[in-house]
Swiss-Prot record:
One of its GO terms (cellular component) is DNA replication factor C complex. Pfam families: AAA (PF00004), Rep_fac_C (PF08542). Keywords: ATP-binding, DNA replication, Nucleotide-binding. GO terms for molecular function: ATP binding; ATP hydrolysis activity; DNA binding; DNA clamp loader activity. HAMAP family: RfcS. This is Replication factor C small subunit. It comes from the Archaea. GO terms for biological process: DNA repair; DNA-templated DNA replication. Heteromultimer composed of small subunits (RfcS) and large subunits (RfcL). The lineage of its organism: Archaea, Methanobacteriati, Methanobacteriota, Stenosarchaea group, Methanomicrobia. ATP binds at residues 46-53. SUPFAM superfamilies: P-loop containing nucleoside triphosphate hydrolases, post-AAA+ oligomerization domain-like. InterPro entries: AAA+_ATPase, ATPase_AAA_core, DNA_pol3_clamp-load_cplx_C, DNA_Rep/Repair_Clamp_Loader, P-loop_NTPase, Rep_factor-C_ssu_arc, Rep_factorC_C, RFC_lid. Part of the RFC clamp loader complex which loads the PCNA sliding clamp onto DNA.
Length: 321
């Protein structure tokens, strides 16, 4: 198959607010700014891949028209976290006059929660000093990591994870344009691995389409290095039945044969346990505690193989109590 060499998340990125998927409440409020040509500082908060950057770019396009790329700048705060990025790049852009008919410019600061406290304090002063010539749109995963003086100067927009329906509809639209077919099971797989993240969903589709123009659930789980939900269910069941040896073989098959990372398996086990309607409440609490301990130990540098086997042992012990 001749798959487009262009990265699909850019190829199919919405060009205007009307094309934004799954964030209707946010879009309606942003449209009011376009209508009045007035814009406060904004704070976009939410998980990755839910449309924060897309909305910022689409807003600038509609606000400025043909001159949008001259009056809009995007910076990623995770690249340079210190105060120098505020004093140099941000301040330099904010202090210059807008071009064309625009009355202000927009600076979009992605991952603003990566800025240090000192950098955020400097940013707050810059936002105040250059409010006439520049509006700031800050994007973050966690608004709690943004200092209160900045939050109080922004209109805050909370982006929700996209629904399975919204992701499936967009995936179907892209698949039709690219001339690929998708099994029903593949839609379920894409929504499972993406967790409301459209960027992850589209990347999974493109990765699978490179392998075959007929996308299956098997392709999706393989290309994203995820275990099938049933494999996680079976692994947990063997542990709770006390069959440590079988569970260990299943775990090693997922980690070594399929190359699934231990932290990804922890995430999938957490999803299975937290969503279960059959597990006893006390047992569920114990299992999540075991997952948290394994996650912490691995984050501190403990051997992942040993910790994953130890996790199975703890789950087996909890199931026997």
């Amino acid at each position: 198959m001749d798959v487009s060499p262009e990265i699909w998340i850019e190829k199919y990125r919405p060009k205007n607010l009307a094309e934004v998927v799954g964030q209707q409440d946010v879009v309606e409020r942003l449209r009011s700014y376009v209508a009045t040509k007035a814009l406060p500082h904004l704070l976009f908060t939410g998980s990755a891949g839910v449309g924060k950057t897309t909305c910022a770019v689409a807003l600038a396009r509609e606000m400025f028209g043909d001159t949008w790329n001259m009056n809009f700048r995007e910076l990623n705060a995770s690249d340079e976290r210190g105060i120098d990025v505020v004093r140099n790049q941000i301040k330099q852009f904010a202090r210059t006059a807008p071009l064309g008919d625009a009355t202000f410019k927009i600076l979009f600061l992605d991952e603003a929660d990566a800025l240090t406290q000192d950098a955020q304090a400097a940013l707050r002063r810059t936002m105040e000093n250059y409010a006439e010539t520049c509006r700031f749109i800050l994007s973050c995963n966690y608004s709690s990591k943004i200092i209160d003086p900045i939050q109080s100067r922004c209109a805050i927009y909370r982006f929700r994870p996209l629904t399975d329906e919204a992701i499936s509809e967009e995936i179907a639209r892209i698949a039709k344009k690219e001339g690929i077919t998708i099994d029903e099971g593949a839609y379920v797989a894409i929504t499972y691995v993406s967790l409301g993240d459209m960027r992850k969903a589209i990347n999974a589709l493109q990765g699978a389409a490179i392998v075959s123009d007929h996308v299956t659930a098997e392709n999706i789980y393989a290309i994203t290095s995820n275990a099938k939900p049933q494999e996680i269910t079976d692994l947990l069941a063997r542990c709770l039945e006390g069959d440590f040896e079988t569970a260990e073989r299943m775990l090693h098959a997922l980690m070594y044969d399929k190359g699934i990372a231990p932290n990804e398996l922890l995430n999938q086990l957490y999803r299975e346990i937290s969503r279960s309607e059959t597990l006893d409440r006390r047992l569920k609490v114990d299992l999540i505690d075991h997952l948290g301990e394994a996650d912490f130990r691995m984050s501190e540098g403990a051997d992942a193989d040993i910790q994953m086997d130890a996790l199975l042992a703890r789950i087996v012990r909890s199931g026997m109590n």
